[in-house]
């Protein structure tokens, strides 16, 4: 018997990838961020009603996307409720790889008089948050549960044992961590492995061409720990615009700082050469810098989502990556600058021990290169047309 070959996906979003070396679940190369879905924060973030949110979810899903990110406190709970209603109406829960988060005070606008234990990393906060998330999402399991941030009061032992209890009982499949120092993540994973518990498989945090702190410790930590990366803020949070564009539209997003202005000009220049958008270059940039990178892409407009999906086909050369790096100098800090940098050599994330200048005194060393990211597919479909 000859087994059929899977049909060609409708867009590049449908070519799925392994989440991380420690999590074999298959996910779309972009993760749909949903923080704007809801009425709870419309006074601050602008309006994104349920119809618009469902349209975004439908477009993402119909384009082949299955990786959706929510959190317990987004929009006062509207986000989880709406995503839960959407999955129930579409009857596609098991097709979706759903991530949510606990730690933030998700009852801040609720009726409870005493709210101190509805936030934090501790066991009670975790139990209450996951129970509420499962109800709002209309599901009996969460694919990926993040510690949203480290509270610096709960012990590593309590966090990892409490999280593992949820995994052992089938309520959670994989664990992630967000907005937490690298040394704490390593400590958590070491404790988990030493005690037969589930370690973290994914890290979520702020990373873009203008905000490269991620590259100091988080990126090498994830490489060493076998963790995937789900960076947010990749598109510059509305700041990656040329001076001309920002003069027209920037009033809605606050002032543009000099760093984003310089990078916006560089990204815009490169985008014009490639007949694309500056934000598409920004997205391709992080996906070219390391393997297992799944940008969290949000927003309220379907046309922007389609641009993000089409950007999956963008190819950046090593020289173009270097140009973006050099547009805004980045100090990697000690000890990496001491080990790798010289008057003629700047630190790059793909460097290995052969690039340590102190070791070149006695020998010319050749080393195995670091693992490279998946190259963008060429010739796959976008929206009704073939890529070139």
Swiss-Prot record:
It comes from the Eukaryota. Norsolorinic acid reductase; part of the gene cluster that mediates the biosynthesis of aflatoxins, a group of polyketide-derived furanocoumarins, and part of the most toxic and carcinogenic compounds among the known mycotoxins. The four major aflatoxins produced by A.parasiticus are aflatoxin B1 (AFB1), aflatoxin B2 (AFB2), aflatoxin G1 (AFG1) and aflatoxin G2 (AFG2). Within the aflatoxin pathway, the norsolorinic acid reductase aflE may play a role in the conversion of norsolorinic acid (NOR) to averantin (AVN). The active site is at 74 (proton donor). The keyword rRNA-binding does not apply. Keywords: NADP, Oxidoreductase. This is Norsolorinic acid reductase A. NADP(+) binds at residues 69, 178-179, 204, 233-243, 300-308. Substrate binds at residue 148. Pathway: Mycotoxin biosynthesis; aflatoxin biosynthesis. Belongs to the aldo/keto reductase family. Aldo/keto reductase 2 subfamily. GO terms for molecular function: oxidoreductase activity. InterPro entries: AKR_Detox_Biosynth, NADP_OxRdtase_dom, NADP_OxRdtase_dom_sf. One of its GO terms (biological process) is aflatoxin biosynthetic process. Pfam families: Aldo_ket_red. Induction: Natural plant compounds carvacrol (CR) and trans-cinnamaldehyde (TC) strongly reduce the expression. Its EC number is 1.1.1.-. It comes from Aspergillus parasiticus (strain ATCC 56775 / NRRL 5862 / SRRC 143 / SU-1). It is an enzyme of class 1 (oxidoreductase).
């Amino acid at each position: 018997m000859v087994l059929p070959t899977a049909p060609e996906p409708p867009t590049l979003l449908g070519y799925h990838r392994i989440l991380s070396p420690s999590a074999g679940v298959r996910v779309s190369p972009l993760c749909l961020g949903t923080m704007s879905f809801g009425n709870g924060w419309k006074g601050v973030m602008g309006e994104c009603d349920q119809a618009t949110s469902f349209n975004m979810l439908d477009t993402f899903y119909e384009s082949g996307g299955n990786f959706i990110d929510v959190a317990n406190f987004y929009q006062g709970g509207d986000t989880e409720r709406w995503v839960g209603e959407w999955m129930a109406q579409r009857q596609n829960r098991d097709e979706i790889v759903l991530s949510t988060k606990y730690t933030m005070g998700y009852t801040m606008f609720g009726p409870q008089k005493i709210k101190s234990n509805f936030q934090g990393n501790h066991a009670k906060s975790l139990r209450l948050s996951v129970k509420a998330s499962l109800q709002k999402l209309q599901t009996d399991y969460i694919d990926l549960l993040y510690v949203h941030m480290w509270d610096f009061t709960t012990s590593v032992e309590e966090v990892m044992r409490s999280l593992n209890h949820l995994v052992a009982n089938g309520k959670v499949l994989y664990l992630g961590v967000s907005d937490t120092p690298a040394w704490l993540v390593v400590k958590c994973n070491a404790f988990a492995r030493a005690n037969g518990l589930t370690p973290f498989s994914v890290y979520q945090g702020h990373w873009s061409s203008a905000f490269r702190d991620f590259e100091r410790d988080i990126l090498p930590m994830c490489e060493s720990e076998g963790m995937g990366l789900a960076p947010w803020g990749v598109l510059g949070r509305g700041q990656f615009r040329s001076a001309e564009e920002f003069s027209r539209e920037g009033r809605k997003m606050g002032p543009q700082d000099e760093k984003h202005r310089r990078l916006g000009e560089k990204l815009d220049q490169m985008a014009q050469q490639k007949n694309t958008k500056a934000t598409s270059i920004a997205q391709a940039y992080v996906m070219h810098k390391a393997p297992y990178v799944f940008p969290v892409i949000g927003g309220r407009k379907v046309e922007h989502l389609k641009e993000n999906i089409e950007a999956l086909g963008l190819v950046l050369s090593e020289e173009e990556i270097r140009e973006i790096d050099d547009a805004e100098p980045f100090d990697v800090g000690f000890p990496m600058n001491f080990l790798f940098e010289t008057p003629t050599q700047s630190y790059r994330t793909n460097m290995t021990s052969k690039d340590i200048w102190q070791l070149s005194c006695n020998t010319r060393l050749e080393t195995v290169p670091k693992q490279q990211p998946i190259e963008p597919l060429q010739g796959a479909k976008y929206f009704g047309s073939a890529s070139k």
